[in-house]
Structure formats: C-alpha cells, structure tokens
Amino acid sequence: KLTAHKADQNGAPVYSYVFSWGTSYHTAEIPFVFNNIDKVSVSGDRDEAEKLSDIMSSAWINFAKTGNPNGDGIPDWEPYTRSNSAVMIFDNETYLVHNHEQELMSLLAPNYKY
C-alpha cells in the first residue's frame, strides 16, 4: 500500500523489493546490503550468500550514488508503478516480478487499489 502511494506522488522513482533468503526475518537483509555477512550467522549456502550480498550491496551503492539501483551484474530493476507493480526478489536467484502477491495484497487491504 505504501509503495503504491509513494509511486503515485510522482517524486523520485520507487524501487520495491522482497528479501526471501532462507529463513529471513525482519532486517535480515541488512548484512547483505552492507556486504558484511561474514560478521553474522546466515542460513543457506555460504557461496550463494556471498553472491547475493555482492548483488544487493552493488544495487544499494548504485542507488546511493545515482538514485538508480541498476548496474553490472544486477537484473534490470524497474521502478514500481501502479501499472507494473515491479518488485525485485532477492533470493538464491535475483529477479524482477510484476504484480507480486496481488491476491495477498487484496486480502490485506481489500478496498485499496494496488
């Protein structure tokens, strides 16, 4: 709901993501974003975790520098709009989906147009 609302404001582009690595919990993506997974215990394959950390930290660095997370080694990340509902999935594979979990979103906020 908040993502759609921010996209409607026509300010800076909005980039939405879901972190689905292993048994992820709230804030579990932080060590991946800052590329310091060696400082914490992470579930899953270590090589895959390092690969994901490289992708995520590159995207966040690109975004901090340019306002756009796209760059070498990162799947094309479209800004979120109501018409595309683009969401980047960060997991063993990193990929972009459109209209992610729309049925679930409709259940959570049935009167809101996503």
Which residues are covered by each model-predicted region?
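C-terminal helix-and-tail extensions that cap enzymatic domains
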Residues: 1-114
